[in-house]
């Protein structure tokens, strides 16, 4: 069985974390040799950067600083975690990657998405996902889910208003048009178990 690089993307409240946990279990049951990781983070240095980028109290962070910090964390994640796993024949399942920067920092912060893309391509070089699952949910539904989930860790981006999250969603639509071959859109208004089964079926097909 070949190894591939898989990413989960979607706006806040799309259920990525829940689906990622279920998918982790289902992939183990299917006998897939893989690692599960996340961004920002995924390596010791990158996790430290995550705390800075998402930390409450850092609301004054300049948008370009945000882009560069996340790209730096991504570089370390690629070098320390993702590439070694792929080289060892392990599939990589990652909660967010480059596309999140294009959507959240590029579109969400009204920055030039092409510039954000080039910064990230410099960081990751040829380590580009083979398959990206976009969990599609309306911005207002996602924010309502966040508000209802009292146990969820609140980060700096959660405090943005709905207009920011709508721009993020519009950004994702542009990204899907930029990279149509690797994206699969999944209706995230379905139950997490249903979403997981849809994604797992496609993963098994990609690995065959």
UniProtKB/Swiss-Prot annotation:
One of its GO terms (biological process) is dUDP biosynthetic process. Its EC number is 2.7.4.9. It catalyses: dTMP + ATP = dTDP + ADP. It comes from Listeria welshimeri serovar 6b (strain ATCC 35897 / DSM 20650 / CCUG 15529 / CIP 8149 / NCTC 11857 / SLCC 5334 / V8). One of its GO terms (cellular component) is cytosol. ATP binds at residues 10-17. Phosphorylation of dTMP to form dTDP in both de novo and salvage pathways of dTTP synthesis. The keyword Electron transport does not apply. Belongs to the thymidylate kinase family. The keyword Transferase applies. This is Thymidylate kinase. It is an enzyme of class 2 (transferase). InterPro entries: P-loop_NTPase, Thymidylate_kin-like_dom, Thymidylate_kin_CS, Thymidylate_kinase. GO terms for molecular function: ATP binding; dTMP kinase activity. The gene is tmk. It comes from the Bacteria. Keywords: ATP-binding, Kinase, Nucleotide biosynthesis, Nucleotide-binding, Transferase.
